[in-house]
């Protein structure tokens, strides 16, 4: 279904946006989707923006206390392109601080799943997924480093699209990890993802990693299941996934199981690279220039920065400490440089399979845990939740997460990964999937 096209064709009743804002305010207090709601919206198709993507004149904090009060004097390239084509900003969405999290609970306002508010919404783009799940006519601009679009999309039952690295400009993004970050989208349909991609991709002089490329729409009939990933998923997810694979097989897709032993190194390689780059990116937040200001200059150097850095959350501090160690001169070659080499090996191996197939897997290895359960997880348990989404993100490949089932009323998703610049082929796959699988939403805020 083309929600964007349908909305633009329909006549909006008088006071539509005021009514939408009023209803959204109530649900936002319940689920924690938005850090900021734009009360000035009065026209255009509503889009939300993850709070680590800059919008001129709107507070942008990446859900961190250290950026409290930061108002960018510019907008990200992707935002300018979409605003030019009739999209209007509904607000800035909640997220794990700086993107550090898989569940949406590493922020001042923990996000809650719209299908069960005792459960997590997924992270780090938690608010983007919640907003998409509760608003009928809406799209979310989000960002993924290791699965930050796919994970919440799966837990909240919406479509999440992560493009090939470089396809959408990162200018205006508050970086987590420069070599891994990708701006992408969430929506209620693959057709709307196609519309968003058409308006967003293309070379940007402000981002040297951005590219101009002609994309084709060709999907693939051969789907590969990677044994090393399949063996690590929860039994209920495995049963659901097996049923989905049977449906696809009956629809004419050729399904194969293959082994990629190197993929087992994805999680440690990802976290070594991302932590090293994150510690560099966070060094700029000192309490002087951006956001939080520490005004007492009578203190000594160490006391001043100790006070400023207290504004970082626990996971941010962990990333800074580990990342700084990894970059140290005495261990850099042992960890960071070796991780870069292994990333290349994994990418080459995956590329060989992706020449004539897509890789299919569940999006997440478990159903959405309760908030209480997630808060009790160790860092290693948290990191292991990304095992299915990290490989494609690590290699810069595009992927799409599609709702595929509902277990005890909770959404689960499948993830389809394509080769470099096979983005629109994945969207075509999603469009075909949606012809036979109906998505369920508990809320349809803003319906006409």
Residues covered by each model-derived region:
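Short, well-ordered alpha-helical
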Residues: 1-76, 98-100, 216, 231, ...
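Residue-level signal for inorganic ion chemistry
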Residues: 7, 20, 193, 223, ...
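Short, well-ordered beta-strand elements within core beta-sheets of diverse protein domains
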Residues: 8-11, 66-70, 181-188, 324-329, ...
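A short helix-breaking turn/cap at a secondary-structure junction
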Residues: 33-36, 162-240, 244, 303-306, ...
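Short, well-ordered beta-strand segments
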Residues: 46-48, 90, 222-226
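Glycine-rich, small-residue loops and helix-cap segments
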Residues: 50, 194, 200, 255, ...
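Short glycine/serine-rich loop segments
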Residues: 83-197, 398-404, 410-413
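Flexible, acidic loop-helix segments that line cofactor/substrate-binding pockets
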Residues: 221-222, 226-227, 258-271, 318
